[in-house]
Amino acid sequence: RDRSPSRGLGDVYKRQVFSKEGKSGNWVSNNLPHFKKIIDEVAFLKAVHTDQFNHGPAQTFMFTGSARLGRPSLGSWVTYGLGSENANLPGFVVLTSGGAAPDAGKSVWGNGFLPSVYQGVHCRSKGDPVLYLSDPKGVNRSLKQKLIKSINDINLKEHEKFNDPEVLTRINQYEMAYKMQVSVPEVMDINNEPEYIHEMYGVKPGQESFANNCLLARKMVEKGVRFVQLYDYGWDAHGDNEGNSLTAGFLKKCQMMDRPVAALILDLKQRGLLEDTLVVWGGEFGRTPMQENRIGIGNLFVGRDHQGDAFTMWMAGGGIKKGVVHGKTDELGYTGIEGRVSVHDIHATILHLLGFDHEEFTYQFQGRPFRLTDVEGRVINEILS
């Protein structure tokens, strides 16, 4: 049965074109011409659901497994389990774009109750890659090294006295910061990439952009960073102004993400990295299939409200079955009717693909073992190769 675009938005979708692409024959919007090139590389989850409907709690839930603050983020769990492959770079790096931070703040890359060494390091694609990493005037590398050694000698005595693991974390962080002063500027410099790569991603060196961040993500994966997390702000298309309308601002966001996302998958593949890298794309919830009239009568702009009962995510890369679709919604796209998967299911699947049994991967805190998937979650075997 033809289950192409929703009918709930009337004339808006009459102006849109969806087509079946690739060997898989999966539907793609004409607003994503580059994504069509990778359609056979990804597995779609068409009936993801969440019980959170506001941005902050939904983002916290999506990235920590709990809508409440205080739990470790997914990247922290993975870094805790896998460690780092590069002694000169953090194991968990965060890159943001879109002009604003996530609504849930730094909690979505926080370490929660895990040791703070597993917290994500927020890097910037414009200006200093990491705030406060550069030395002040009058401090050279030699003096900095002596200062860190003196501080860490004191910290070691502190650890011998109190046996506090956070002191060891502090020592590691000082040493990592010293190493990062050389390693981070190098890996964050996209000027050293060839022109055809710049064109492939659509990057503009010196600017903060999602395209730049996609290229930086590839560079970091290449250098052995275990977990790279990209956040792009500005997808909240309620239709309360032109920038948030489906017919203007939303289409610009599609154009902004289309080329670099396809480039990232193709670039990883051509370098032989995709089979060992898991790429996950999605948001904290979906949008309603019907129009939202937030402003009221006479609203010139078209938007959609938050919707947690059915939305789409996709995965590609290591261990993922290519070109498959798992899950189905009703004819309006309002609720999932087959193959529903929860946030805990997604976490269980990610951990499984990275080599963990999500039920056994725990951390003891306040007298009991905690895990990312809490007491729920199943591996989505239907999308595994």
Model-derived segments and spans:
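Ligand-binding pockets and gating/stacking loops
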Residues: 1, 7-385
